[in-house]
């Protein structure tokens, strides 16, 4: 089923190291074409969903990429704070915004990025692409294991665990509407 997706096939071919199941069983980490595979997704809930699905794919079918430290998640900002006086600052989550509000006197303009596509080329380079200034999170096997487990539980056929998860975590949800 996974290999029916054209984008997944393209990714596998781009990596150059094969796929461990149903694609010739020819996974060979020594043929990897890139030192870093960077997942770039929006800083919102939808981006987190996409990242979780990709981590699940890597964990289940190409775990060596994670074990050998090749998978990273880019951390794009969620906000840009621009004070009347002083330097603008990128903020990566709501906690950072709350802290910024408490520690900065005076008025400031706040821009919220709904997605990477809302940034102009210069902003995207400065915040997410430039190796000198970007923030990358190395994916560890436990991150991928948890992503896979949550994906299986939320998308699987077993209703009781999903219902329980929703009830237990409903108050923690950050709605992006």
Can you say where each PLM-predicted feature lies in the sequence?
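Conserved phosphate-chemistry cores used by DNA topoisomerases
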Residues: 1-177
